[in-house]
């Protein structure tokens, strides 16, 4: 049976991950730890014999720079890359820039958990005159006003990620090309929910660690057979737990 592999990588720790702030579409860069995580992901992939024909990422530099570091370790810096806003992190609306623990102290752990992980729950909206509104950013100049979010739930994130998967990424895989995607916690959760047919309750508890390669294997009909992280299982579990705890009051 022919098996096709897909590799997903959540960007390495960003400066705002380090500061425990809601990031969303804010274009913050990797921390020093995040750069190390991205390089380590590339080394792991090289050790496991992975190489790629095409890469996808978002238009946010924490994902782009993660991909750069991964491909550099693979000696594949030349690889063609498509960047799309449809792989961006979920837009956190008016929460962007706020400290997660302080927000939990103000609104309660459960409210913040719902904002972070609830399926159809949207954080408070931005206004269009807010400097954080993506309509002020030249990289989104070609998007219609309808496409520019004031806030997003995971459900709304799925509405942009999955058509991009079905229309753009999957056809490339079906043509025989080996693909890697470097993206974000919630854009990858959107894809994982779809691939694994997860319920809304199941996705609430899913936390994807930073900078760890997640491998999906597909059968000849491009149905997922299995998935697994590369690396030390205990370290990966600890990193996922740390992601879950970011939204709790101190």
Swiss-Prot record:
Family: Belongs to the phosphoglycerate mutase family. BPG-dependent PGAM subfamily.
Range of residues in the leader sequence: none
Protein name as annotated: 2,3-bisphosphoglycerate-dependent phosphoglycerate mutase
Function: Catalyzes the interconversion of 2-phosphoglycerate and 3-phosphoglycerate.
One annotated GO molecular function: phosphoglycerate mutase activity
Keyword Transferase recorded: no
Binding site for substrate: 10-17, 23-24, 62, 89-92, 100, 116-117, 185-186
Residue positions of the active site: 11, 89
Documented EC number(s): 5.4.2.11
EC primary class: isomerase
Catalytic reactions on record: (2R)-2-phosphoglycerate = (2R)-3-phosphoglycerate
A biological process term (GO) from this entry: glycolytic process
Organism ancestry: Bacteria, Pseudomonadati, Pseudomonadota, Gammaproteobacteria, Enterobacterales
Subunit composition and interactions: Homodimer.
Gene expressing this chain: gpmA
